[in-house]
Amino acid sequence: MTTYDTRTATDTRGSEQPGHVGTASYDANAITVLDGLDAVRKRPGMYIGSTGERGLHHLVQELVDNSVDEALAGVADRIDVTVLADGGVRVVDNGRGIPVGMHPVEKRPAVEVVLTVLHAGGKFGGGGYGVSGGLHGVGLSVVNALSTRLSAEIWTDGHRWTQDYRDGAPTAPLARHEATSRTGTSLTFWADGDIFETTEYSFETLARRHQEMAFLNGGLTLTLTDERSSARATAAVDEADSDPTAKTVSYRYDGGITDFVVHLNARKGEPAHPSVITIAAEDTERLLSAEIALQWNGQYTDSVYSYANAIHTHEGGTHEEGFRTALTTVVNRYAREKRLLRDKDANLSGEDIREGLTAIISVNVGEPQFEGQTKTKLGNTEVRTLLQKIVHEHLADWFDRNPNEAVDIVRKAVQAATARVAARKARDLTRRKGLLETAALPGKLSDCQSNDPATSEIFIVEGDSAGGSAKAGRNPQYQAILPIRGKILNVEKARIDKVLQNQENQALISAFGTGVHEDFDIAKLRYHKIILMADADVDGQHISTLLLTFLFRFMRPLVEEGHVHLSRPPLYKIKWSREHVEYAYSDRERNTLLERGRRDGRRIRDDSIQRFKGLGEMNAEELRVTTMDPDHRVLGQVTLDDAAFADDLFSVLMGEDVEARRHFIQRNAQDVRFLDI
């Protein structure tokens, strides 16, 4: 049951939330300095990944992560984020407040040290926090360094305190104000437009991440408010009882990750068992806790998402490994004990068992070992041990206490295994390029001459006629063409044997060379740029969605690593004269070009304005100039910032729930991107 609670939170200092490991002392002595702030403004990408839209939103997340750390320590239960009318962002929590006492080494207020010195904070040296997220503890100082202004307001030690910063440096000493019993921190920053490509925040992006954080921190209320004009503030949050035109959304899930699983499974049809299985354990000596929630549904793909200290570890790690190992062991043992597998039958594979499984794995680790600066894979071996132990014990017990549901789960896995055996020959489609050239590759593939995947690209083109134009208009040195004919399978409604028997899917798998699912190997990818090129109408968008669903469900790393792109063919050809031709990619752009031309005194007949009904209406030269030539084409890279959101979206668009799809279309009807005019 999803609930939204906007009540004012009470002071929770001194309390400990179940499953959250914290330490008691958090003052100036708890702040440890590891390094000075250096060159952040010169090389921002080293600290936040990019200076584009993703990096901009990362600044907000860094402040939110620090507030969430207070919740993990059991001393905060509310975070309010506001996008201000002037483009600033304010993050307020009701935690203990950043320490304001004099730092023993730096000889200045601790808050100033935290905001101006890289690697300074309560996350190091065991001070202040048992567990924490953030970008390796550099968050607050990096946000300050990449902002033109930052204002800090703190309620701690019985008073309100303030300090302002410009370009990362304080403009005045820390000021003490009136006495108060309130505690917490408010940080407001204005991102530097000279550093970032854009300073325009997406309400939808922020709302999705806030909802995710609320799921991962049961009982924590996160509120997002947008004070910009309504034209710029669109809140397309994914909740049926949220107003998509509202400027304020609030998330609170007292069920935590159990509610997360219910939310994800809501679009996936009838669950295989009514209740969500929940597992929780804590090791206080090693500052380690774990929560797991799982439930099977009637779908054919799995949705397993793991988090460490509230950070999505999309590459998995030891927590996922421990979970998967124990899950496979328990289900196979139960299947043998209950004679659901015969003696001669092979064990069920992990892939068989996870078919239709939705699971959230959330661990809090005192000393997390992440692989890479971006924290995408957890490496702590003790986490694997803990997860294996608790999943084995709790899941085996649940199976014993719920025999009917357990049998249904095992039978579903047995059916998946049968389908896997039937699809074994299709799985042999993964071949390297040398083999592909002599094997039964789809004859329709027009390969490129280059053997270098890094410089090669493949266009997946809808229809034979468009494929012919694309083949004639391509640069054969590095551009390959694969026309898609016939019916493209909706993989959201099909088991893997049916998916791999589909002729078009076979062609895609052969051409890419990577294999699918557990056989997937991105090192075998033959083209580092995969471009979906469909008609610029609703039918074309539907075909692109079918292809994206296939890639997301069976070749997700292609999306995660940025190899998938959508072409943007023009909608209109405007022929002013034989020598002067322009192309418009939308109705708005067509109108703008026509108005500008008429202002310049040019005339045009109605029959000189052509609306392309499909790619096949363009000749090879037009297709080359507008859609294929890297110097002129418009491409959109498909990115995956939120896998759980994408999972839910594909379930809505391509799944069995007609009512959810109708609701989604109604909510987004105001967005012109969904209209075929």
UniProtKB/Swiss-Prot annotation:
UniProt region (Novobiocin-binding), positions on chain: 154-295
Entry's induction text: By novobiocin and repressed by sucrose.
Domain Toprim stretches: 456-570
Highest taxon in the source lineage: Bacteria
Reactions the enzyme catalyzes: ATP-dependent breakage, passage and rejoining of double-stranded DNA
CDD domains with a match to the protein in the record: HATPase_GyrB-like (cd16928), TopoII_Trans_DNA_gyrase (cd00822), TOPRIM_TopoIIA_GyrB (cd03366)
GO terms of biological process kind: DNA topological change; DNA-templated DNA replication; response to antibiotic
Cofactor(s) demanded: Mg(2+); Mn(2+); Ca(2+)
Cofactor binding summary note: Binds two Mg(2+) per subunit. The magnesium ions form salt bridges with both the protein and the DNA. Can also accept other divalent metal cations, such as Mn(2+) or Ca(2+).
Binding residues for Mg(2+) 1: 462, 535
Location within or outside the cell: Cytoplasm
PROSITE patterns: TOPOISOMERASE_II, TOPRIM
Annotated EC: 5.6.2.2
Record-linked SMART domains: HATPase_c, TOP2c
GO molecular function list: ATP binding; DNA binding; DNA negative supercoiling activity; metal ion binding
Matches recorded under Pfam families: DNA_gyraseB, DNA_gyraseB_C, HATPase_c, Toprim
Coiled-coil ranges per UniProt: none
Keyword field: Antibiotic resistance, ATP-binding, Cytoplasm, DNA-binding, Isomerase, Magnesium, Metal-binding, Nucleotide-binding, Topoisomerase
Signal peptide positions on this chain: none
Subunit details: Heterotetramer, composed of two GyrA and two GyrB chains. In the heterotetramer, GyrA contains the active site tyrosine that forms a transient covalent intermediate with DNA, while GyrB binds cofactors and catalyzes ATP hydrolysis.
PANTHER family reported in the protein's UniProt record: DNA GYRASE SUBUNIT B, MITOCHONDRIAL (PTHR45866:SF1), DNA GYRASE/TOPOISOMERASE SUBUNIT B (PTHR45866)
Function: A type II topoisomerase that negatively supercoils closed circular double-stranded (ds) DNA in an ATP-dependent manner to modulate DNA topology and maintain chromosomes in an underwound state. Negative supercoiling favors strand separation, and DNA replication, transcription, recombination and repair, all of which involve strand separation. Also able to catalyze the interconversion of other topological isomers of dsDNA rings, including catenanes and knotted rings. Type II topoisomerases break and join 2 DNA strands simultaneously in an ATP-dependent manner.
Something else known: There are two genes for gyrB in this organism. One which is novobiocin-sensitive (gyrBS) and one which is resistant (gyrBR). Few gyrases are as efficient as E.coli at forming negative supercoils. Not all organisms have 2 type II topoisomerases; in organisms with a single type II topoisomerase this enzyme also has to decatenate newly replicated chromosomes.
Name of this protein: DNA gyrase subunit B, novobiocin-resistant
Gene assigned in the entry: gyrBR
